[in-house]
């Protein structure tokens, strides 16, 4: 047995091997040490007879019926677990029982419900990068979702954005991707996912064949991948990894979704985090995020669909309006919406249920849940009949899965056991054979009595009895006192005693075998019938998946309508105008966290022409960041098809939303706050377009005043300039000198958050008004924050001193054109460089680098 273990273990050296021995999964050697440490299991040994403890084989084990709990703990810690089962019956096995690994469980290949988060997809990813071509593929094997994205050029930001969007638990890479360091660093540090090397799995022809076979394609062109060889390699490598770990049919992975430009908005990591789309920046939890506000879904698949919609805002006004029209109908019909929500509330996770059915890991309870889901479908279709919107009409045409409901309802008892191998799953009447065996098992004594009576009549021996003992089993006892009677020819003598003879007949032997093996036969037959039923249901995987997807969409639409009613949202007008007009907008998350204070709504108006850039000034803590974030969130909410927290809103679709809000030192990568800020600014200016929305908060604050002011102005002017960018931009700053740009830079306007002083106190009014703020009230904010009075008093003294010095004739004046003086005009080298530079040809990053170079030269 040890040799068998070592042979199997050698094939799965990167896994913890769960080796089936009877009712336990055992681990040996180093696996045992790891499992003992990680699972708090007692470490024992099989060979206690060995004198030297160091030579003994360490081992530990877990019961097979509760192994999922232990496996889940190991997977959560990043381990891979190989399940090695007995693949033949130990009773009939000749010699050593055959064993083999039937499945490898990894963080990205989990299907067991106890290891999965209901409202969150569990993605496995693959990345391919070579010769400037990059692609990524993602699959949630618990549901069958399979997505592919391809990117052109050497810029890795797109693939990083997709990694951030899907957040895979596990990622496989080819050598080229691993050598970038950018991809593995992002995956490990930002996502915390397990990394695997793909080896030779990315060879194009093999990958193309694998993709075609899996999705039933005659050629790669049918999937839209004819011009995307990198995507084919990523998808093929992912399919191979799934096949190697799952070792079973993947029939539920049947549709490939190609992420192409023009469908979904791309969101970078910084934007996703700073806007707190799915988790709070402070706690990392769902509470405090946009997802938390919008998630009134009632089904697990609806929860995952909502998360996907938030992560994938739409770019097509037509597709957005399709969702909004459906939400509007549900919003207006409280009765139907309430009944739909009540019906959805009792539905289980159809997507993952059908996945387990296909994989062969479903149990009786799973089928009962699937049956109950199917039972609710006719009512949902009935409730949707009056609606006219295209999306709700489409959903109402879902397959009600009547055949699946009928088959499960006929076969499976209402309260089946958890295990499918212990019997008790099938209803009476489903199988005559099972019913007969159950009757024998439950009425064995009656069967024996009936045979005994039958034999008495047949033989005429009134004292004939049928008895049983553990040595001889069942026997017919004929007392010698019965006299000279004729013993039937089919009676076979088993034992002779002093006063009686014991016989058996073929019929009695068959009854004995039946009685003694009835339970085992029942278990095997019920298991076989159950697996046959699962196979029949699995053949309808396409219908179940389509219905589950429709229910998930309906769940999200109902949630949007319910949130809109509860929170007083309005239906936005979405178009391609480039306008962004929000009346009395509110921050969707902040307003839900305020208990006794009413949220102060504010207007926003931006467009692609005369009102492109809004400079927002005002005190710290007054709400500048909240105001800008709410504008971004309202825009994103509209583009996922949700109503928005405002009195009215016109949202011209934006292609990207970028944010540069707040920062903290990235010590792990050696980046300071300022360096991180500049990296993010460079990324924004490199990828934004005139159709983007930019949210920039206090650019340049991480360096000296004049350096920061210079950078802030340069960035702001670049954003405003139609020839360079011309994007809709909200720009919060404490550099009040930038207010002078209104009127001198086309498209720039000043706004401020009002505040007023009452004695020594500062009152935040939270209202956005036209014009620049006249003061930052920094000292007043310091006082509000609890800075000691002596420090505040000293600060006021210094402030008066600095203001007096600034007003003095000796104070250095800015240049006449109000341009910020970056360098001493007498610095010849700096002047020469400036005169010879074509500023209009510089990229944002080149401009920042040039600015840094000039600063160093000016300082000597």
Regions found by a protein language model. Name each.
Residues 363, 853, 857-859:
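Short, small/acidic-rich helices and loops at N termini and domain boundaries
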């Amino acid at each position: 047995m040890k040799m068998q273990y070592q042979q199997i273990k050698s094939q799965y050296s990167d896994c913890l091997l769960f080796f089936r021995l009877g009712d336990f999964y055992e681990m040996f050697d180093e696996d045992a040490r790891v499992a003992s440490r990680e699972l708090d299991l007692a470490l024992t040994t099989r060979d206690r007879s060995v004198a030297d403890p160091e030579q003994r084989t360490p081992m530990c084990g877990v019961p097979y019926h509760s192994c999922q709990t232990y496996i889940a703990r190991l997977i959560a810690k990043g381990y891979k677990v190989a399940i090695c089962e007995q693949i033949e019956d130990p009773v009939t096995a000749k010699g050593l029982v055959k064993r083999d690994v039937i499945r490898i469980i990894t963080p990205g290949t989990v299907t067991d419900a106890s290891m999965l988060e209901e409202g969150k997809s569990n993605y496995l990813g693959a990345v391919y990068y070579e010769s400037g071509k990059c692609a990524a593929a993602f699959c949630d094997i618990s549901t069958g979702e399979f997505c592919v994205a391809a990117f052109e050029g050497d810029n890795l930001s797109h693939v990083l954005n997709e990694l951030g969007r899907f957040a895979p638990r596990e990622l496989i890479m080819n050598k080229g991707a691993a050598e970038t360091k950018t991809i593995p660093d992002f995956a490990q540090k930002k996502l915390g996912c397990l990394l695997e090397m793909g080896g030779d799995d990315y060879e194009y022809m093999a990958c193309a064949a694998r993709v075609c076979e899996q999705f039933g394609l005659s050629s790669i062109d049918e999937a839209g991948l004819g011009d995307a060889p990198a995507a084919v390699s990523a998808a093929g490598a992912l399919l191979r990894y799934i096949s190697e770990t799952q070792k079973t049919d993947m029939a539920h992975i049947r549709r490939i979704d190609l992420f192409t430009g023009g469908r979904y908005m791309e969101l970078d990591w910084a934007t996703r985090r700073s806007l707190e789309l799915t988790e709070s920046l402070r706690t990392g939890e769902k509470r405090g995020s946009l997802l938390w506000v919008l998630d009134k879904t009632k089904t697990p698949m609806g929860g995952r669909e909502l998360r996907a919609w938030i992560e994938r805002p739409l770019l097509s006004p037509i597709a957005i309006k399709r969702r909004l029209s459906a939400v509007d109908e549900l919003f207006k019909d409280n009765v139907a919406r309430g009944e739909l929500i009540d019906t959805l509330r009792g539905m289980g996770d159809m997507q993952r249920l059908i996945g387990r059915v296909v994989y062969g890991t479903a149990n009786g309870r799973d089928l009962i849940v699937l049956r109950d889901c199917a039972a609710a479908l006719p009512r949902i279709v009935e409730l949707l009949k009056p609606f006219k919107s295209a999306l709700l009409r489409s959903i109402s045409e879902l397959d009600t899965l009547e055949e699946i409901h009928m088959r499960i309802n006929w076969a499976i008892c209402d309260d089946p056991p958890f295990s499918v191998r212990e019997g008790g799953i099938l209803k009476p009447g489903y199988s005559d054979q099972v019913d007969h065996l159950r009757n024998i098992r439950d009425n064995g004594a009656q069967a024996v009595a009936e045979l005994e009576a039958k034999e008495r009549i047949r033989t005429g021996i009134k004292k004939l009895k049928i008895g049983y003992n553990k040595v001889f089993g069942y026997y017919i006892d004929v007392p010698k006192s019965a006299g000279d009677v004729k013993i039937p020819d089919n009676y076979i003598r088993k034992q002779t005693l002093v006063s009686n003879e014991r016989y058996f007949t073929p019929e009695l032997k068959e009854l004995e075998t039946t009685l003694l093996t009835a339970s085992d036969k029942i278990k095997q037959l019920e298991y076989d019938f159950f697996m046959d039923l699962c196979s029949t249901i699995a053949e309808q995987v396409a219908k179940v998946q389509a219905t589950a997807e429709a229910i998930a969409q309906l769940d999200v639409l109902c949630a949007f309508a319910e949130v809109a009613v509860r929170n007083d949202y309005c239906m936005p007008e979405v178009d391609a105008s480039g306008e962004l007009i929000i009346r009395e907008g509110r921050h969707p998350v902040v307003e839900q966290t305020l208990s006794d204070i009413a949220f102060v709504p504010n207007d926003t108006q931006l467009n692609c022409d005369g009102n492109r850039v809004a400079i927002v000034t005002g005190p710290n803590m007054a709400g500048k960041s909240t105001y800008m974030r709410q504008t971004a969130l309202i825009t994103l909410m509209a583009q996922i098809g949700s109503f928005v927290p405002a009195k009215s809103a016109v949202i011209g679709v934006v292609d990207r939303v970028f944010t540069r809000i707040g920062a903290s030192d990235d010590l792990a990568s050696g980046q300071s706050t300022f360096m991180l800020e500049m990296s993010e600014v460079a990324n924004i200016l490199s990828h934004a377009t005139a159709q983007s929305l930019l949210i920039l908060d206090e650019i340049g604050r991480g360096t000296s005043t004049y350096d920061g002011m210079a950078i802030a102005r340069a960035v702001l002017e670049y954003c405003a300039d139609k020839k360079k960018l011309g994007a809709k931009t909200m720009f919060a700053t404490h550099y009040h000198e930038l207010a002078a740009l209104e009127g001198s830079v086309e498209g720039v306007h000043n706004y401020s958050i009002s505040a007023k002083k009452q004695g020594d106190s500062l009152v935040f009014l939270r209202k956005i008004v036209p014009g620049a703020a006249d003061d930052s009230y920094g000292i007043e904010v310091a006082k509000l924050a609890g800075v000691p009075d002596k420090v505040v008093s000293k600060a006021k003294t210094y402030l008066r001193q600095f203001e007096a010095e600034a007003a003095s004739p000796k104070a250095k004046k800015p240049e006449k054109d109000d341009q910020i003086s970056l360098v001493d005009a007498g610095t010849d080298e700096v002047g020469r460089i400036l005169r010879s530079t074509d500023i209009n040809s510089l990229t944002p990053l080149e401009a920042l680098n040039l600015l840094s170079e000039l600063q160093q030269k000016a300082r000597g």
